[in-house]
């Protein structure tokens, strides 16, 4: 044997002359690569012309200039923190740099490996993966894929997967060391979502057990020093953005109605400012759709004196094809030499950092976003419209300077910016119900939650509440250990209450119906209520209405959808959201597969039986027994145990005010509403959830006195049945 030793090429080694292929590519117009650079190494097909066109644009991105430095740094370190301004190209390019390096290192081409890039939002995971598939000249779902809740668009051929942070957490439950992955990239880490924060702690442990795994943490803001400290002094790399100067304007006085002010500002910009697209930040779907209608109407009233506009909404539940419209060009002038056209994007804070839209010159920032808030004392989690942070305001204004100098109109005072806005967005883990998170951690084998390495540890009270809820649901025993029921619950991508409702539904002989209800609750609202046809929409909804509540109304809609062969025309005629129904059908099929895996029976009570709806309502109560409200003599509802005054949401389908209701959602607005409610009977509380309705630790209220009577009634019935048996 000879003594010559081959040098093992390490992951991310940079070639002796790394510029050589790039030079060749630039001079020959070929992509980076070796001899076969005309052939796409990922699918074996020749590159298309579009690939070369996109490649030229990719080379102009700031991150491209630091490719070698990035690969060298990552080669020498297990963890790397990368800060890149939005628009630097980090989300699309870094994962591609990584898969090329991993591919170069993997000599056995049959060995499967994967690079994962997490996104906090579904829209970003889908949109970015499509863009990267286009850049790599491959088919989405093949070499490049994405995975979001209830939708997996990947295959065994996938080498690069964009996925929501929540989906990577779910994968960790089945594969605690994430063995399939060679590199994991946590993108948009500055957003500090609940799932990202849990992944921080989890991956820190995984890295100790897997020296071959690499981690890249990417952020758009300079809170990176905190990430560095957390990841034991990992190196920090900064990529500049392509920011032009942005002029910032504040209002002189606080705006009473930010929506009207935003619309007014759009019209003024369109009338008075030079060409350039507009980005408006609003808080949610309803507000955005309302603004889009009003902008079209206001500009339409101006006639020929202004150019044409294209108003495009952007929010998470928008169909993917509609989401892609944000990348369409602005409309051409109506007549040659006439006023220029303008694109107006009206978006949630998803356009802050997750997606980059070229052509934006004007940004309108009302200073608000919807944020999750949680009060552990009364166990209420709700989405509230809240002021944004200074960091978010900075990100928003930066959207205006991507292609040329821009302007940002902040619809609040400079004093308010300086004095009222927090420096950073409060991490989600500090303002969320942690029941689902605790269940996930328990499934991952992490029992000591108090000492789990959270970057920002949640309040002990919030953790205690989560443990208490899971104990009542039977997911944890009295010692805090995961039960068999808890293990099954953790497999469902649902909140713990809904998972429990599904698991126990066979005991009530109604699992088919509970599957349909769960699927309907897991998708956007199926009822469409256009402003110009509200009366007709309300009449259509009333036809599906069930007098005993909203859950049963949703069941009626699902049954009618299936009976009408999932016909889109039927949906249109009945003011039903066809996409939501198709999603519900897809969700239901996935839930059926999980039920089958655990041998949970598919069954239904005979539709003609008087117990048909009773059994469904009892099964729902078995999951949602902690979300019950009682009608007091005063005419308002009190949440049971927490004694919060609440009102039935106006959208409910009940034709009466039941004494007891279960509710799906607690909505905090000017009044406290409970939404998606169903009538239940008081005695069921005693039958289905006696462990929770233990009167020894019950606050004094009317509901307690009623339940006391129900317990006494049950005792009498037991005594009588004993006597009868004798």
Swiss-Prot record:
Record motif DEAH box, residues: 187-190
UniProt keyword annotations, A-Z: ATP-binding, Helicase, Hydrolase, mRNA processing, mRNA splicing, Nucleotide-binding, Spliceosome
Residues covered by the Helicase ATP-binding domain: 71-240
Reactions catalysed according to its record: ATP + H2O = ADP + phosphate + H(+)
GO molecular function annotation: ATP binding; ATP hydrolysis activity; mRNA binding; RNA helicase activity
Positions of ATP binding: 84-91
Any Pfam family the entry gives: Helicase_C
SUPFAM superfamilies: P-loop containing nucleoside triphosphate hydrolases (SSF52540)
EC id: 3.6.4.13
Ranges where the Helicase C-terminal domain occurs: 265-445
Top EC group: hydrolase
InterPro entries: DEAD-box_helicase_OB_fold (IPR011709), DEAD/DEAH_box_helicase_dom (IPR011545), DHX15_DEXHc (IPR044756), HA2_WH (IPR048333), Helicase-assoc_dom (IPR007502), Helicase_ATP-bd (IPR014001), Helicase_C-like (IPR001650), P-loop_NTPase (IPR027417)
Source taxon at top rank: Eukaryota
Any single Gene Ontology cellular-component annotation: nucleolus
Keyword Transmembrane helix: no
Annotated disulfide bonds: none
Keyword ATP-binding annotated: yes
A biological process from GO: RNA splicing
Family: Belongs to the DEAD box helicase family. DEAH subfamily. PRP43 sub-subfamily.
Biological function: May be involved in pre-mRNA splicing.
Protein name listed in UniProt: Probable pre-mRNA-splicing factor ATP-dependent RNA helicase DEAH2
Species whose genome carries this gene: Arabidopsis thaliana
């Amino acid at each position: 044997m000879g003594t010559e030793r081959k040098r093992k090429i390490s992951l991310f080694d940079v070639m002796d002359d790394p510029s050589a292929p790039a030079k060749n590519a630039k001079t020959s117009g070929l992509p980076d690569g070796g001899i076969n650079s005309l052939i796409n190494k990922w699918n074996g097909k020749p590159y298309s012309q579009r690939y070369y066109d996109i490649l030229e644009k990719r080379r102009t991105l700031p991150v491209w200039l630091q490719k070698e430095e990035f690969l060298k740094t990552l080669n020498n370190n297990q963890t790397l923190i990368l800060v890149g301004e939005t628009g630097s190209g980090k989300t699309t390019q870094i994962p591609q740099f990584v898969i090329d390096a991993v591919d170069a290192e993997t000599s056995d081409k049959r060995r499967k490996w994967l690079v994962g890039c997490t996104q906090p939002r579904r829209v970003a995971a889908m949109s970015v993966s499509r863009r990267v598939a286009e850049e790599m000249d491959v088919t989405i779902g093949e070499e490049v894929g994405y995975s979001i809740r209830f939708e997996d668009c990947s295959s065994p051929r996938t080498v690069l997967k964009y996925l929501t942070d929540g989906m990577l957490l779910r994968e960790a439950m089945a594969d605690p060391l994430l063995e399939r992955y060679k590199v994991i990239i946590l993108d948009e880490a500055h957003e500090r979502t609940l799932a990202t924060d849990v992944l921080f702690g989890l991956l820190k442990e995984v890295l100790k057990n897997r020296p071959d795994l690499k981690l890249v943490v990417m952020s758009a803001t300079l809170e990176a020093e905190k990430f560095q400290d957390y990841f034991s002094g990992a190196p920090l790399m900064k990529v500049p953005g392509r920011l032009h100067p942005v002029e910032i304007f504040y209002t002189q006085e606080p705006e009473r109605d930010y929506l009207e002010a935003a619309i007014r500002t759009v019209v003024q910009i369109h009338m008075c400012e030079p060409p350039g697209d507009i980005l408006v930040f609003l808080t949610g779907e309803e507000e955005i759709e309302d603004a889009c209608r009003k902008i079209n109407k206001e500009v339409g009233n101006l006639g020929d004196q202004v150019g044409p506009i294209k108003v495009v909404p952007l929010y998470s539940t928008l169909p993917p094809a509609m989401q892609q419209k944000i990348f369409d060009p602005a409309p051409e002038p109506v007549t040659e030499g006439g006023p220029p056209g303008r694109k107006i994007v009206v978006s949630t804070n998803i356009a802050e950092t997750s997606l980059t839209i070229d052509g934006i010159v004007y940004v309108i920032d009302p200073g608000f976003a919807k944020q999750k808030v949680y009060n552990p004392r009364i166990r209420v989690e709700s989405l509230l419209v809240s002021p944004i942070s200074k960091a978010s305001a900075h990100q928003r204004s930066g959207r205006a300077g991507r292609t040329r100098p821009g302007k940002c109109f902040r619809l609040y005072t400079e004093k308010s910016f300086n004095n009222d806005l927090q420096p950073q967005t409060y991490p989600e883990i500090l303002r969320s119900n942690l029941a689902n998170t605790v269940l996930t951690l328990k499934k991952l084998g992490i029992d000591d939650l108090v000492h789990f390495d959270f970057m920002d540890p949640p309040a002990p009270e919030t953790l205690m509440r989560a443990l208490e809820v899971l104990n009542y649901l039977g997911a944890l025993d009295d010692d805090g250990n995961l039960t068999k029921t808890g293990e099954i619950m953790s497999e469902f991508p649902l909140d713990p209450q809904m998972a429990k409702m599904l698991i126990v539904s066979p005991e009530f002989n109604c699992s088919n119906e509970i599957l349909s209800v769960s699927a309907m609750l897991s998708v956007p609202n199926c009822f469409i209520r256009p402003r110009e046809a509200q009366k007709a929409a309300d009449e259509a909804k009333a036809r599906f209405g069930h007098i005993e509540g909203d859950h049963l109304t949703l069941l009626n809609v699902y049954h009618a959808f299936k009976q009408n062969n999932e016909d889109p025309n039927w949906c249109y005629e009945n003011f039903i959201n066809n996409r939501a129904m198709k999603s519900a059908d897809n969700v239901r099929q996935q839930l059926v597969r999980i039920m089958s895996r655990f041998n949970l029976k598919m069954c239904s009570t005979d539709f003609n039986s008087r117990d048909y709806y009773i059994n469904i309502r009892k099964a729902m109560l078995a999951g949602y027994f902690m979300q019950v409200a009682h009608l007091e003599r005063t005419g308002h509802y009190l949440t049971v145990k927490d004694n919060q005054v609440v009102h039935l949401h106006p959208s409910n389908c009940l034709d009466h005010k039941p004494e007891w209701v279960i509710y799906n959602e607690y909505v905090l607005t000017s009044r406290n509403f409970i939404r998606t409610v169903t009538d239940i009977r008081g005695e069921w509380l005693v039958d289905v959830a006696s462990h929770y309705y233990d009167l020894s630790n019950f606050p004094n209220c009317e509901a307690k006195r009623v339940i006391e009577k129900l317990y006494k009634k049950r005792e009498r019935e037991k005594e009588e049945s004993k006597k009868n048996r004798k």
